[in-house]
């Protein structure tokens, strides 16, 4: 039964397609961040949110891997000792299949790629803040009649310090979530406005060049604001914008950015789908798993529809066997598992501890190797015992009782004044040798012959070692 459910579960888990992020621009937008500082703050929060979710997924997969190793060690150890492992073990183990690792690796790579874009945009928004500046006036003095010999005094640039970065906009006071990521991010275009302003007497009257006080003032500005419009004339009372243009910092397209945000959101959702093996909902809520419970635990046909009383029975079986909370699952599965003894390699020797004391990947990996080796040895020893004694042992002979029931290769012996049916090892050996001779003879007659001999041990080890390497 355990093998059957394990096989069905593995088929189900491997049939699940890998979850990948897709790209499609959102239709709803957040409130626009109107300044570079606000946009940089928004991207910073978005970056930290993504990093936190990636770290959670990596940690979850890492812990799942350790739990899977423990489950496999416990399963092999129980099997080697003649016991049975519950169907929960098989399912939880299968849930740590390569498909889950593929989901993590693929979507983590997508997220890291998108984070590179976010970090680059954030840096450029801050860069715009650092180049936002206004020059002090460059002046041209009057020389009495005209300006051709008037003196020019050069001004300098002063970086504009903003205080808006000390606070957040209402849109960005809350932490981002999946709803936030399902929208366009409302990011301001990365442009830098350049303006050249001209004034006569700095708005103090007409300029006749009659005296050195009749100055023409020229000012340069760079910032992220609207570039404004140029004036057709220079009014003596106002500063006129003589030149204005936008400098495009990068050639980003808003639809491309929005599509990237969608891919980012989908990749994060895919990471969230990695199950937490300490939560019973990771498997009891799975429709395919419930179908398996109905088939294997309740002996229902695989085509049984899970409705009504059948579904109620399945839900009760899930609750009884696996619990409905992490604490119940711990009591029913993890605590007994952690109490099991496991042998592992350490400092060139084999040590034995409870599974709960094995915390490193090296300890768990070597413990799995030891468990596999022991399981193979037990199987081979059992096979040799069967071949040697013709499938009979002292225990099976004793169970037959005395008298006519005690037949070769068993025989009656007297121990402590009582008759017992015990295995006659010489007779058992003769029976086994005769069986081998008969098998060889059948082979010469064209019938099936077992030619593996001692090689069967190596043949049996191959799939086990492959399973060990693929874990």
From Swiss-Prot:
It comes from Trypanosoma brucei brucei. Residues 158-168 have a biased composition (Polar residues). The lineage of its organism: Eukaryota, Discoba, Euglenozoa, Kinetoplastea, Metakinetoplastina. Residues 1-21 form the signal peptide. This is Variant surface glycoprotein ILTAT 1.1BC. A lipid is attached at residue 454 (GPI-anchor amidated serine). It is found in: Cell membrane. Residues 214-226 have a biased composition (Basic and acidic residues). Disulfide bonds join 397-410, 406-421.
């Amino acid at each position: 039964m355990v093998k059957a459910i394990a096989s069905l579960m593995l088929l189900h888990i491997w049939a699940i397609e890998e979850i990948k992020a897709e790209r499609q621009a959102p239709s709803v937008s957040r409130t626009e961040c109107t300044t570079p500082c606000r946009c940089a703050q928004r991207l910073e929060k978005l970056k930290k949110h993504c990093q936190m979710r990636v770290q959670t997924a990596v940690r979850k997969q890492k812990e799942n891997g350790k739990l899977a190793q423990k489950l496999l060690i416990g399963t092999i150890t129980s099997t080697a000792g003649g016991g049975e492992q519950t169907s929960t073990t098989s399912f939880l183990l299968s849930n740590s299949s390569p498909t889950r690792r593929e989901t993590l690796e693929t979507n983590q790579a997508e997220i890291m790629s998108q984070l590179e874009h976010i970090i680059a945009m954030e840096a450029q928004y801050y860069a715009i803040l650092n180049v936002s500046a206004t020059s002090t006036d460059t002046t041209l003095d009057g020389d009495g009649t005209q300006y051709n010999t008037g003196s020019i005094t050069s001004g300098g640039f002063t970086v504009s310090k903003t205080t808006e970065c000390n606070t957040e906009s209402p849109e960005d006071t809350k932490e981002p979530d999946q709803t936030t990521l399902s929208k366009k991010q409302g990011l301001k275009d990365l442009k830098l406005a350049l303006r050249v302003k001209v004034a006569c007497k700095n708005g103090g009257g007409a300029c006749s060049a009659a005296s050195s006080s009749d100055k023409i003032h020229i000012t340069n500005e760079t910032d992220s604001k609207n570039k404004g419009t140029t004036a057709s004339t220079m009014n003596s009372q106002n500063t006129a914008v003589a030149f204005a243009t936008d400098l495009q910092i990068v050639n980003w397209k808003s639809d491309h950015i929005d599509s990237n945000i969608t891919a980012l959101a989908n990749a994060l959702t895919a990471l969230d789908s990695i199950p937490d093996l300490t939560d019973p909902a990771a498997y009891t809520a799975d429709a395919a798993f419930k179908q398996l419970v109905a088939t294997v635990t309740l002996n229902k046909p695989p085509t049984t529809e899970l409705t009504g009383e059948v579904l109620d029975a399945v839900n009760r079986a899930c609750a009884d066997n696996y619990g409905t909370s992490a604490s119940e699952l711990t009591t029913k599965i993890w605590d007994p598992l952690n109490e099991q003894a496991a042998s592992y390699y350490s400092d060139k020797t084999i040590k034995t501890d409870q599974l709960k004391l094995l915390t490193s990947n090296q300890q768990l990996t070597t413990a799995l190797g030891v468990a596999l080796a022991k399981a193979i040895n037990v199987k081979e020893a059992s096979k040799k015992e069967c071949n040697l004694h013709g499938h009979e042992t002292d225990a099976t002979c004793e169970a037959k009782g005395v008298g006519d029931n005690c037949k070769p290769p068993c025989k009656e012996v007297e121990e402590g004044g009582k008759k017992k049916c015990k295995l006659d090892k010489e007779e058992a050996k003769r029976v086994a040798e005769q069986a081998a001779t008969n098998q060889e003879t059948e082979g010469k007659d064209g019938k099936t012959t077992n030619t593996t001999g001692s090689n069967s041990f190596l043949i049996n080890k191959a799939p086990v070692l492959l399973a060990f390497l693929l874990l």
